[in-house]
Design a protein with these regions (language model features):
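Short cysteine clusters
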Residues: 734, 739-743
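N-terminal accessory regions of nucleic-acid-interacting proteins
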Residues: 780, 787-811
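Conserved RNase H-like, two-metal-ion catalytic cores of nucleic-acid enzymes
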Residues: 802-871
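Conserved DEDDh/DEDDy metal-dependent 3′-5′ exonuclease domain
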Residues: 843-917
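Short His-Asn-centered micro-motif
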Residues: 367, 386, 546, 605, ...
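Helicase motor core with emphasis on the C-terminal RecA-like subdomain
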Residues: 32-75, 79-82, 86, 92-190, ...
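Extended Lys/Arg-rich polyanion-binding regions
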Residues: 408-411, 417-434, 452-464, 480, ...
Length: 987
């Protein structure tokens, strides 16, 4: 039975937890009642009390200034915790530091004190405080003002929030007079500060510190983007002569220093040992008989009646809305004191909920990970995790939201049906013993790197020696952008300029694709990213927003919008689809127990082919509705296991369902990988195939779900042996017989978890682990696309121009230009070029190395000469010269091999350039006259002058052609007045 189906079932009337205790926020009494409960007590598989720990204090190596010491005294802070003292020492010394200690350990002081001290010492100094959420910025400004309140008003540091809600008037005031502490977010840094750095001179010239809060959120796609944003920030600071110290604040993760260094490319010192005290905390693991959602509703209802301030975390937007809806039905008089909270809400809705929770108006909130970060919603007593959050880090981070200010608290993990949930129900001690996962990013993601190279070049020209281009893959991306006309080299070929002035708005830092708006009745009610839009908001899908059910009536892909209408139905929907993969490049290979494992670049094609309607009560399949949606095609990184032929033969001999075995292995491995990598299964995709055409063997693929890849499967490849053993343990340890969501079923399987054979999968994994049937063939894929970047130290395009290959150069070519008798205005516009008539036509013939002039009555001879050429070159020849000729005399140019230089320029740049402009920049010459003068000469009978002018145009066009052929580029003056290169290939 599905989660939704179970959750909608009626309950017995006895309360799960006796609620006859007086209100008083007594967490211990709540926990005792839960354990003693007849309905739920026997489902508690583990209860651990984490004891309170005392504070560990330390003095900074150098005493704070009198002003800062006075701030601490006024705030009632007699001493710093040990981690605060260590981190402030580093930040005050100008070192880059990453502080990764538990939630509510006082990390704010580690960066606030050094910044305040520097501002008081040097009023010209500035700092940027970067927060991933607007609400965090509001909280931080309040904290700064409270701490600085004891200073004389004239000495208090100024602060300002600069985000999307800041009015244009205040934005201008902030730019003109930057505050000591500018509080902003990644988007504003990317979209406003960096591209307009000349308007922020006082900020960047005085920048001493950059504070990055919630660093652990900068992983995956967003982290890969931010790695480039921080490098761009470093370039701009270098332009203003500053080198600010970075201070990172993070939840406890496995690699804070490595992540900070990957984000910035700078050496970073870590502080991970917390000196903050902690209150006692109960941790309970509960494996429900009903769904996790049903159990969460029961626990929340009981907590509300006891006055416990509670947060419930769910794994999806949909489940957040459903639990919020169901608790209102169960909570009686407390129904109005609970709200849902998720990222799809509009900003003003989220702010209202945060304020109501902080004030105590709300007792409970049901949230996605959107409230995992340190937004101030007041002191909480109870955290209910409706399903394992996907990582040990997230579980501790969410649990850390409760029990602040020394209050006893409790965290209840309610297991779902997923593999990791059940894994920890069977091995609870491992949850507490496991170190937190490592966060990974992939700055080398080509799709992401290319976007930021263009942004960086728009901010400041990129020298070929710039550290941005140190990586060979990034250099290759720069060359590709140059070939596309998005980056332009200067005349000397030593610097890149951006072709566009503001490419920044085409870059979405928080996703690899764009956002779709969700509209109801003409009003925007939410947003969804492109990858999810196809699966969750396809036509006919059920979409829930703030407890209201909607039906999707249209998915408008060109306009990037989803149209929904309110609708009450007794079913939910689940997308169905199919996927294929092509191997583009092998990045790594090894063997695990004799099994070949590869890492590489993949092209994934995913098509949503339809959707299931399933009854809300019980999950019964009602119907399958076909859909006709375009495929999603993207390149990413992934790993694949090649199943040895002897292993497949062994399964076939035992009459196992081989496709069911590898399909189950794929699901189980995706489910278990979040134990090894900081991610959740929704960030990964998989494909299993009994015969991959490039490999010639059965393969199981697991890939990064984000275009370009974000490093998840790279880390999984490094831990491939552990991934295999963990997958076997998950399958073998599950008590089900034929497969379930706890081992080999996937909640997002596009084929409805068919075929699946758990028994066969277990046998398959045991054979792979045994090493008894190794694959002797290397199994390297065939038909790879060679796309190797240049090696370090290899000369780049500035040193070795991409001249046209000899085999592509024509043996005999001509250059043609035509002058007319009549102007466009005389024949009704440029569309009537065929009515203009020919005054003179000039053809340069490379075989003769001479120019021949033709009058209108000599055009048949011109046509005959053209047919003898291997290539005809012109400037606007296709749209103009050929049309003029066709109107003057019967002429069919379609069989002539033609190169139109203007057409190539337009295709590369997106706009047109004049022949005169190209000639001046490239050749240092120019046209001898203009077309208007030639028209006047025709009326005056000055044919020789027209012929001389036309011949000069032909010579200029010829020289542009040969320059581009020999050098691989032309030169032109861009919109900023810079002489830059335009790459060309005359093929």
């Amino acid at each position: 039975m599905t989660v939704a189906g179970k959750a909608m079932q009626s309950e017995t009337h006895s309360p799960p937890i006796p609620d006859d205790e007086p209100d008083g926020r007594d967490v211990a009494a709540y926990v005792a009642a839960l354990i003693a409960s007849e309905r739920l007590g026997h489902l508690v598989v583990h209860h651990r009390v984490l004891p309170a720990t005392p504070a560990v204090f330390a003095d900074p190596a150098r005493p704070f200034s009198r002003a800062v010491a006075g701030l601490l005294t006024a705030k009632g802070i007699p001493a710093l915790y040990s981690h605060q003292a260590r981190a402030t020492d580093l930040a005050r010394a100008g070192r880059h530091v990453a502080v990764a200690t538990p939630t509510a350990s006082g990390k704010t002081m580690t960066y606030l004190l050094p910044v305040l001290e520097e501002v008081i010492r040097n009023p010209d100094s500035r700092a940027i405080f970067l927060y991933p959420l607007k609400a965090l910025a509001q909280d931080q400004q309040k904290a700064i003002r409270e701490l600085a309140a004891s200073l004389p008003e004239s000495a208090r540091p100024t602060t300002a929030i600069y985000d999307g809600d800041t009015s244009p008037h205040f934005r201008r005031k902030i730019r003109d007079n930057p505050p000591h502490i500018l509080i902003t977010n990644p988007e504003m840094l990317h979209l406003s500060l960096l591209p307009n750095h000349e308007n922020w001179g006082a900020l960047f010239a005085g920048l001493s510190h950059v504070v990055v809060d919630e660093m652990h959120t900068y992983r995956g796609v967003m982290g890969s983007h931010m790695a480039h944003v921080f490098r761009r920030l470093t370039r701009v600071c270098r332009r203003f002569g500053t080198s600010p110290a970075y201070v990172f604040s993070s939840a406890t993760i496995g690699n804070p220093g490595q992540l900070a260094e990957d984000l910035t490319g700078l050496p970073v010192t870590t502080v991970t040992e917390s000196g903050a005290p902690t209150a006692a905390r109960h941790f309970l693991f509960l494996n429900p008989e009903q769904s996790a959602a049903t159990t969460a509703v029961m626990l929340l209802a009981a907590a509300l009646k006891r006055g416990l301030r509670t947060i419930v975390y769910t794994q999806s937007r949909k489940m957040t809305e459903l639990i919020s809806l169901w608790i209102r039905e169960k909570a009686g008089p407390y129904a109005s004191r609970v709200s849902a909270y998720r990222s799809g809400f509009l900003a003003e809705e989220r702010r209202d909920i945060e304020a109501a929770m902080a004030s105590g108006k709300l007792l409970g909130v049901v949230s996605t990970s959107a409230l995992e970060l340190g937004i101030d919603i007041g002191g909480l007593d109870l955290c209910i995790l409706c399903g394992y959050p996907g990582s040990v880090m997230s579980a501790w981070q969410r649990g850390g939201r409760v029990g602040r200010a020394g209050r006893e608290s409790a965290v209840v993990l309610i297991a779902g049906e997923d593999a990791l949930d059940q894994y920890f129900m069977r091995h609870p001690a491992e949850f507490f013993d496991r170190p937190p996962e490592s966060a990974v990013i992939n700055p080398a993601n080509p799709a992401i790197a290319a976007k930021h190279l263009e942004c960086a070049a728009a901010e400041l020209p990129i020298e070929l020696t710039d550290p941005l281009l140190a990586d060979a893959g990034i250099r290759a991306e720069a060359e590709r952008l140059e070939q596309q006309g998005l980056l332009l080299r200067d005349r000397e070929g030593t610097r890149y300029f951006a072709a566009r002035k503001r490419p920044h708005r085409d870059v979405n830092l928080r996703g690899s694709g764009g956002q779709f708006t969700i509209e109801a009745g003409g009003a925007v009610i939410g947003q969804i990213d492109e990858m999810r839009a196809y699966r969750e908001t396809h036509p006919g899908a059920v979409y829930i927003h703030r407890g209201v059910s909607y039906l999707v009536t249209a998915l408008d892909i060109p306009e990037r919008r989803v149209v929904v209408a309110p609708g009450t139905v007794d079913y939910y929907t689940r997308a169905r689809g199919q996927k294929t993969t092509e191997i583009l490049e092998v990045l790594g290979e090894k063997q695990v127990n004799g099994v070949p494992v590869f890492l590489g670049r993949l092209k994934v094609t995913e098509t949503v082919t339809g959707y299931e309607r399933r009854r809300a009560r019980g999950g019964q399949l009602l119907s399958i509705v076909p859909l006709d949606l375009p495929p999603m095609v993207f390149e990413t990184e992934g790993l694949w296991w090649v199943i040895p032929q002897d292993v497949q033969a062994e399964l076939d001999k035992r009459l196992f369902h081989f496709m069911g075995a590898i399909h189950a292995m794929e699901h189980a491995m995706i489910g278990i990988l979040p134990l090894l990598v900081l991610t959740d299964r929704n960030d990964l995709g998989g494909i299993s195939t009994p015969l991959h055409p490039q490999v010639g063997r059965a393969c199981v693929f697991v890939y990064d779900g984000a275009p370009g890849g974000v490093g998840l499967t790279r880390l999984a490849f490094a831990k491939a042996d552990e991934a295999l053993s963990r997958t076997l343990a998950a399958v073998a340890g599950c008590p089900c017989e034929t497969g379930c969501p706890s081992c080999v079923h996937s909640p997002k399987c596009g084929s409805g978890n068919r075929p699946i054979d758990k028994v066969a999968a277990r046998y398959l994994l045991e054979l792979l682990m045994s090493g008894k049937l190794p694959e002797t063939d290397p199994c390297r894929p065939e038909g790879l696309i060679s796309n190797e970047p240049p090696q370090a130290g290899e000369p780049q395009a500035a040193d070795k121009p991409k001249a046209a290959k000899a085999k592509n150069a024509p043996g005999r070519y001509g250059v043609l230009d035509v002058e007319t008798r009549r102007a466009a205005a005389e024949v009704g516009g440029w569309g009537n070029a065929h009515k203009m008539g020919v005054s003179v036509a000039v053809l340069y013939d490379s075989g003769l190395d001479d120019c021949i002039t033709y009058a209108q009555d000599e055009l048949p001879a011109l046509y005959e000469a053209l047919t003898r050429l291997d290539l005809v070159v012109g400037f606007n020849i296709l749209r103009f010269d050929y049309k003029v000729l066709a109107g003057a005399s019967p002429f069919d140019h379609r069989k002539l091999p033609t190169l139109d230089i203007l057409e190539r320029v337009h295709a590369r740049l997106g706009y047109r350039l004049s022949l005169d402009g190209l000639a001046k920049a490239t050749l240092g010459t120019q046209k001898s006259a203009s077309g208007l003068e030639a028209l006047a000469w025709w009326k005056e009978g000055r044919i020789d002058e027209i012929a001389a002018y036309c011949k000069q145009d032909v010579i200029v066009t010829r020289d542009l052609y040969t320059f581009g052929r020999d050098n691989g580029y032309l030169l032109f003056s861009n919109k900023a007045g810079k002489i830059v290169r335009l790459p060309v290939e005359w093929e």
